[in-house]
Amino acid sequence: MQIFVKTLTGKTITLEVEPSDTIENVKAKIQDKEGIPPDQQRLIFAGKQLEDGRTLSDYNIQKESTLHLVLRLRGGMQIFVKTLTGKTITLEVEPSDTIENVKAKIQDKEGIPPDQQRLIFAGKQLEDGRTLSDYNIQKESTLHLVLRLRGGMQIFVKTLTGKTITLEVEPSDTIENVKAKIQDKEGIPPDQQRLIFAGKQLEDGRTLSDYNIQKESTLHLVLRLRGGMQIFVKTLTGKTITLEVEPSDTIENVKAKIQDKEGIPPDQQRLIFAGKQLEDGRTLSDYNIQKESTLHLVLRLRGGVYASPIF
């Protein structure tokens, strides 16, 4: 019988075959006609890649059926994509394939539109314009596919240089996730990033929705100088709060961070260090407060009376 083989260039090759011919035989016939080595050929029928040892009749390929010929580049390899349902999809890819290409292959196999796909490898969400080799994804690596809920949105991040970065995010993304996306785009390590929205520094473990950050919101990125440090604040109940600060932060800034974490208005806070009450306009470095120093927080009661500190 006759079958047709269509190439990516649109050329159609006619082959004389038997239903009992193996896919290997068919590739040999294509080599005879077109000079393409069998190991560089991938044959597709009804959306499936055909295996060398199987026959045309195994795949119900009948007279005048059309196969599609795709060339396997030298670097061709298989990777796996695992879905949340536990299903594993096998893909034929090249190291030079972009994440966008991979999403298109998943759409071909599973019908999931690329804009609803998020691909994760080694804990990182993969960006469309980057390649598999950029992420060191090698043969037989497993990617994880997470569906992007309709809530997916764009936000903007403005740097001190005036540059604006566009990010694809979910309301459920944590600030930590957002910093990882900025690292992917700009190469800035998360521990050097401070993100500000509506005048507040954003905490790693909180989500965008926690801060009411919506589509097309703009965050401000400030680089944390190497002087960034942790200090502790001990309350009268004995609870210890950890804060990320800079030596140049004012006491007012520190009180704002405490308000973010604990909900205590700054005007009800008194901070004590080395027996001294700290003044709002002064900085941590003014008081020689260094990394891992402990401040004591005393609440200023409404009537102007103070709760006594217990040190």
From Swiss-Prot:
Site residues by UniProt (Essential for function): H68
Residues marked Interacts with activating enzyme (site): R54, R72
Transcription found in the keyword field: no
GO cellular component: mitochondrial outer membrane; nucleus
Signal peptide boundaries: none
Modified residues annotated as Phosphoserine in this record: S65, S141
Cross-link Glycyl lysine isopeptide (Gly-Lys) (interchain with K-? in acceptor proteins), sequence positions: G76
Keywords: ADP-ribosylation, Cytoplasm, Isopeptide bond, Membrane, Mitochondrion, Mitochondrion outer membrane, Nucleus, Phosphoprotein, Repeat, Ubl conjugation
Residue(s) carrying ADP-ribosylglycine: G76
Superkingdom, taxonomy of origin: Eukaryota
Residues covered by the Ubiquitin-like domain: 1-76, 77-152, 153-228, 229-304
UniProt keyword annotation of Cytoplasm present: yes
Annotated Gene3D superfamilies: Phosphatidylinositol 3-kinase Catalytic Subunit, Chain A, domain 1
Propiece residue ranges: 305-311
UniProt-listed SUPFAM superfamilies: Ubiquitin-like
Cross-linked sites for Glycyl lysine isopeptide (Lys-Gly) (interchain with G-Cter in ubiquitin): K6, K11, K27, K29, K33, K48, K63
Miscellaneous note of the record: Ubiquitin is encoded by 4 different genes. UBA52 and RPS27A genes code for a single copy of ubiquitin fused to the ribosomal proteins eL40 and eS31, respectively. UBB and UBC genes code for a polyubiquitin precursor with exact head to tail repeats, the number of repeats differ between species and strains. For the sake of clarity sequence features are annotated only for the first chain, and are not repeated for each of the following chains.
UniProt subunit comment: Interacts with SKP1-KMD2A and SKP1-KMD2B complexes.
Record-stated family: Belongs to the ubiquitin family.
Protein name per its UniProtKB record: Polyubiquitin-B
